[in-house]
Amino acid sequence: MGSNIVIYFSIIVIVTLNVNGVPASDLFKSVSQYHIPRSKVINKETVTKPLQFQRAICRLLQKLGEETFARLSQSELEAKQLDLIKTCYQANSFGDNENQGHMQRMDRNYYGWMDFGKRAIEDVDYEY
């Protein structure tokens, strides 16, 4: 019961507040920009099934990485990747120490962006 409350609270925070400096409204603007229907990211089903919502956020971040970050310099790329990696893992983390520790390890052991969305989705699937 307690974990359900934390999960739904996480969804509300993602939808209404800034997540690691990336406003949720910017994520949804990007959904329109890349012609991904808003309903694919959040709808009645994803609100009642938090795992699907988290996976949709990871897919969106992967799409943004593929199309946007290709035009950035290497230093800009690394800074933005790290921010969005944190955002994605916050979307998947419900505050337990294991997830937070994994996010910190990712900070230190950065791996290529193009593969990140796929790995993040696999990590979420594995945890559940």
Swiss-Prot record:
Propeptide segment residues: 23-108, 120-128
PROSITE patterns associated with the record: GASTRIN (PS00259)
Residue(s) carrying Phenylalanine amide: F116
Pfam families hit by this protein: Gastrin
Primary location class: secreted
Residues annotated with Sulfotyrosine modification: Y110, Y111
Subcellular location: Secreted
Tissue specificity comment: Expressed in both the gut and the neural ganglion.
Disulfide bonds: none
InterPro entries: GAST, Gastrin/CCK, Gastrin/cholecystokinin_CS
Signal sequence region: 1-22
Keyword Nucleotide-binding: no
GO cellular component, one term: extracellular region
GO molecular function, one term: hormone activity
Swiss-Prot/TrEMBL keywords: Amidation, Cleavage on pair of basic residues, Hormone, Neuropeptide, Secreted, Signal, Sulfation
GO biological process: neuropeptide signaling pathway
Family, similarity comment: Belongs to the gastrin/cholecystokinin family.
Name of the molecule in the record: Cionin
Natural source organism: Ciona intestinalis (Transparent sea squirt)
Source lineage: Eukaryota, Metazoa, Chordata, Tunicata, Ascidiacea
